[in-house]
Regions:
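N-terminal secretory signal peptides
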Residues: 1-8, 23
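Short, flexible active-site loop motifs that bind/organize anionic cofactors or intermediates
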Residues: 3-4, 43, 103
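N-terminal pre-ligand scaffold of iron-sulfur
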Residues: 15-18, 22-25, 29-96, 122-139
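Detector for glycine-centered tight turns/loop "hinges" at secondary-structure junctions
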Residues: 76, 113-114
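Short cysteine/histidine-rich metal-coordination sites, predominantly Zn2+-binding motifs
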Residues: 99-106, 115-124
Length: 139
């Protein structure tokens, strides 16, 4: 006995599967926190309020098209790094353990940018910043 209307066609299954994969891909593109973007910033320009830089993480900002991580090295001191991993160019992120590349697992010291664990062999490129009053500014 053949049930004509109770079966899905191969085409219906493929279309539904493709739509599901497309929705999953789009979900991965969104939902993240908005990263502030600065263009044409110069020495002395405010990057972020010091209070917005978490003591155990990093503040992310896009500076002239490149992602920058600002980390706290002491209560009133910070460091900043280009977030591009020197290994293969993935974007380094703040984690519970410091700064890490999600692509290949390189880990970096938030205070110095030095490599803690490879495969990266070079430190993160520093971005010159300083604390001025209650703000982190480009220097």
């Amino acid at each position: 006995v053949r049930l004509e209307h109770d079966c899905l066609s191969r085409r219906a299954v493929l279309l539904a599967g493709g739509a599901g994969l497309g929705a999953l891909g789009l979900a991965g593109c969104g939902g993240g926190a908005d990263v502030p973007e600065l263009t044409g910033a110069a020495a002395g320009d405010v990057l972020v309020a010091l209070a917005d830089v978490p003591p155990d993480g990093a503040y992310e900002v896009t500076l002239d098209g490149r992602r920058v991580l600002v980390t706290r090295t002491a209560e009133d001191a910070v460091a900043a790094y280009d977030a591009e991993c020197p290994h293969q160019g993935c974007t380094v992120r703040a984690t519970a353990d410091g700064l890490a590349c999600p692509c290949h697992g390189s880990a970096f010291d938030p205070a110095t940018g030095e490599v803690l664990e490879g495969p990266a062999t070079s430190p993160l490129a520093p971005v010159a910043v300083e604390v001025r009053g209650d703000d982190v500014v480009l220097s």
